[in-house]
């Protein structure tokens, strides 16, 4: 994939080249999107809209840290959806990892989470944020133990993983496909910015419906699909149950009891 690759720290140019090689990125000077390596982090910028600022993965501070400390623990909806309130600590595969926020919440509650991200730029951002989180004195140890990243299309990845001899099937497959955002729906400034940049970079998740069948084959216990409250069921399949929040709902497809 082509994108502008820029290093603001001359000492990190070789790191940027390694990132490009790892994720299959080619430098395009005129690209509207730039992947920028600063002295602190890897970030994505939309060069024709500088007011949008930079997008990067921060699992250590800010909103993510606040949610980890004050978000309601195992009583929050996502925890109930994956079955944490049943006394189990499931192994989770997050098939649409994005910036890793939901995966991080589940890992902070004790789950081992394998993240799959199909877009190379998003995967590169997530990998950088994960590496920085692993260095943090407060959370680094358990982040390293519980969170891992695989870059591949979720559809292909699920089948590829199932074919591996040493692969341990997850208890839960978690999906949060990108969904078109109605103009009249209110979102926070941060989420609006990210959605705007991501949807122009990644495009719509038009093949999201195709995720459900392989997810149901892979999960030993359940599949959880996060949807906006106004969205239809994924692949038009009715879930076993739904857990509703103010703006979203978690559609739960049960294969077996959590016990």
Curated annotation (Swiss-Prot):
State if Iron is listed as a keyword.
no
* MF-aspect GO terms: rRNA (guanine-N2-)-methyltransferase activity
This enzyme catalyses: guanosine(1516) in 16S rRNA + S-adenosyl-L-methionine = N(2)-methylguanosine(1516) in 16S rRNA + S-adenosyl-L-homocysteine + H(+)
Mind telling me which InterPro entries this protein's record contains?
16SrRNA_methylTrfase_J, SAM-dependent_MTases_sf
Q: Please give the family membership noted in the entry.
A: Belongs to the methyltransferase superfamily. RsmJ family.
PANTHER family per UniProt: RIBOSOMAL RNA SMALL SUBUNIT METHYLTRANSFERASE J
Q: What is this protein called?
A: Ribosomal RNA small subunit methyltransferase J
Species assigned in the record: Aliivibrio fischeri (strain ATCC 700601 / ES114) (Vibrio fischeri)
> Which lineage ranks, top first, belong to the organism behind this chain?
Bacteria, Pseudomonadati, Pseudomonadota, Gammaproteobacteria, Vibrionales
Gene designation per UniProt: rsmJ
